[in-house]
């Protein structure tokens, strides 16, 4: 038994963690966009 075949098997937990991190990053980016937009609107309303 070599290390070749076992490397091709992806750990489901790793995949889940990867997806979670991506989702969190996406949400954070969206929140930042919303905050920037809110600040812009606020400054224009003054």
UniProtKB/Swiss-Prot annotation:
Out of the domains of life, which is the source?
A: Eukaryota
Give yes or no: UniProt keyword Membrane.
no
Q: Keywords of this protein's UniProt record, alphabetized?
A: Amidation, Hormone, Secreted
- The signal peptide, as residue positions, is none
Give any GO molecular function from the UniProt entry: hormone activity
* Subcellular location(s) of the protein: Secreted
Q: Does the keyword Hydrolase apply?
A: no
What is its biological role? Regulation of fluid secretion. Stimulates primary urine secretion by Malpighian tubules and causes a dose-dependent stimulation of cAMP levels in the tubules. Has a greater effect on the transport of Na(+) then K(+) ions. In vitro, has synergistic effects with the smaller diuretic hormone DH(31) which co-occurs with it.
What is the protein's name according to its record? Diuretic hormone class 1
Q: Which organism is it from?
A: Diploptera punctata (Pacific beetle cockroach)
């Amino acid at each position: 038994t070599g290390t070749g075949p076992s490397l091709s098997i992806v750990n489901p937990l790793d995949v889940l963690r990867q997806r979670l991190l991506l989702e969190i990053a996406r949400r954070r980016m969206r929140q930042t966009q919303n905050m920037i937009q809110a600040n812009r609107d606020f400054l224009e309303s003054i």
